Amino acid sequence: MTTPVLNTDFPGLKLAARGKVRDIYDLGETLLIVTTDRISAFDVIMNEGIPHKGYVLTQISAYWFRQMEGIIKNHIISTDVADFPKECQPYADVLAGRSMWVKKAQPLAAECIVRGYISGSGWKDYQSTGAICGIKLPEGLKESDRLPQPIFTPSTKAELGTHDENISFEEMCRICGTEISTKVRDVTLAIYEKARDIADQKGIIIADTKFEYGIYEGELIIIDECMTPDSSRFWPKDSYKPGGPQPSFDKQFLRDYLETLDWGKTAPAPPLPEEIVRKTGEKYMEALVKLTGKGI
């Protein structure tokens, strides 16, 4: 099995942040985002990485960013290492395929979730309240049902190791401002509807997904990642059957395994068997091939 890239360390480059998956380097006016093979579940980073996961996430994000350019601009300057600043070139072998040279935007203080199907925390909320983030839904929905129309459900941005909290659209307006929140909501729904139709033709259901936005030179742009198996629920269309959980092309497979363990969902993470690592990697790769027609 290929050795995963768990951490990066590039002498001469300033490490600005190390998140659950991405290492971010400050290049002055721009940023270098390196997507590692780290994987987290329940907000805990696993000890093992998933080989090629960083490559898959970067390529899927780049694919969707290109598809959505008619709706909103994104933060990418280039994904071709040859275009990166000269101080990045000594590390080209590690950076190739798993990194982005991006604009330095001011992130909005909310994460923007759109749900086209009822699953996960949304399903739990619906069971107890009949609503998600205060949005009342029809009675009688089953787990994994398609919603009558997609809904926008923002959340707070949590610190590393803590959980995001769902908030109402009205609360987002108080945090970010009504004008920008309304634009973000409209753009998020437009992106989702276009992506849902594209993915449907490729045999994938995008049940829900999460976006991050920023302001760059006074303009709203989309940043971070875009509709990857880390930020989305991807279900195989050919086996879709409402009334329960769905098989998926994302890390739900890993979550399901962890749910079978006597583990409190706090660090340290339990060791992952090689089979779980391999099968998780296969699901990520399958999503890339189905969407883009290309593998490694």
Swiss-Prot record:
| CDD domains attached to this UniProt entry | SAICAR_synt_Sc (cd01414)
Pathway annotation from the record = Purine metabolism; IMP biosynthesis via de novo pathway; 5-amino-1-(5-phospho-D-ribosyl)imidazole-4-carboxamide from 5-amino-1-(5-phospho-D-ribosyl)imidazole-4-carboxylate: step 1/2
Specify the superkingdom.
Answer: Bacteria
Q: What Enzyme Commission number(s) does the record list for this chain? A: 6.3.2.6
Q: Which InterPro entries match?
A: SAICAR_synt/ADE2_N, SAICAR_synth
**Enzymatic reactions:** 5-amino-1-(5-phospho-D-ribosyl)imidazole-4-carboxylate + L-aspartate + ATP = (2S)-2-[5-amino-1-(5-phospho-beta-D-ribosyl)imidazole-4-carboxamido]succinate + ADP + phosphate + 2 H(+)
Give yes or no: UniProt keyword Ligase: yes
Swiss-Prot/TrEMBL GO biological process terms: 'de novo' IMP biosynthetic process
Give the GO cellular component terms, alphabetically.
cytoplasm
Q: Provide the alphabetized UniProt keywords.
A: ATP-binding, Ligase, Nucleotide-binding, Purine biosynthesis
The keyword ATP-binding appears for this protein: yes
Gene Ontology molecular-function annotations: ATP binding; phosphoribosylaminoimidazolesuccinocarboxamide synthase activity
Q: List the disulfide bonds.
A: none
The record's comment on protein family reads:
Belongs to the SAICAR synthetase family.
Name of this protein: Phosphoribosylaminoimidazole-succinocarboxamide synthase
Q: Which gene encodes it?
A: purC
